[in-house]
Amino acid sequence: MELERSRRTAAAMAALCLLAASAYIWRDKDEEAVMASAPAAVAASGDWGLSFQTEGAAPVGNATAEHLGQYDAYYLGDTGKKVIYLTFDCGYENGYTEQILDALKKHNAPAAFFVVGNMIETAPDIIRRMAAEGHIVGNHTFHHPDMSRIADQAAFREELESLANLYKETTGQELPRYYRPPRGKYSEENLKQAQALGYKTVFWSLAYVDWYTDNQPTADQAYAKLLPRIHDGAIVLLHSTSRTNAEILDALLTKWEDMGYTFASLEELPECR
């Protein structure tokens, strides 16, 4: 058991070394250009992307909410309410997650933390705190691979179930059935596979380039992305490894509250229609 765990940990660490280099679809190009070029497609496959067309309005995704909905997949919440769904991707512990949890607790704001195997193995107390404070801990796979390249159902299931099993070993609880594809890479078959395993796939409708730990945005740069683009029903993606996110989260939540927004759990997402 321990030998297998060590092997999995080594594999996870190797995969995480690629995380900063491959992050999300905006990595290799200018953020604005990639966002603006994301088409309003019907097909659900490829790299998740967004096009922000009107300030304060929900962006257009490269798959429609209706098409994603048939697979219990989301990129928007309730767009009829001034509500925000906070989510954090946690590839590893970088020393900022507890500060983020403190800010969430201060604002009584629920969040979802999408974690990988390394995060649970190296920071079990933080994982237990997330659960104890009422946050969702979601499945970001064990090794953080490109899931769009995994067509085999057994291999896909193993990535999710090994993470779910580790979470249960660590907390004594079942892992909530929310899944986020690593780096936003997915295929329509993946969405079907996740749905068959009882998962809701959660993309996002607002994010910014916050994952380069050695090139963090300033607070003003973060606000310039996150404030004008916020919209009703936003599913916000932030990274828990970001120093800037930890430093501004309290003030950011206050600013959103001053704009009339409240915060909701993914458990409150509207049923897919």
Language model regions located:
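Alpha-helical scaffold elements lining the catalytic groove of polysaccharide deacetylases
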Residues: 63, 96, 145-171, 185-232, ...
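Terminal accessory/targeting
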Residues: 1-84, 102-111, 232-273
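Histidine-centered catalytic micro-motifs
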Residues: 136-143, 184, 238-241
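Conserved strand-turn element in the central/C-terminal portion of the radical SAM core barrel
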Residues: 181
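Active-site beta->alpha N-cap acidic-glycine motif
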Residues: 49-151, 155, 159-168, 175-176, ...
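A short acidic, amphipathic alpha-helical/loop segment
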Residues: 99-100, 125-129, 190-193, 248-252
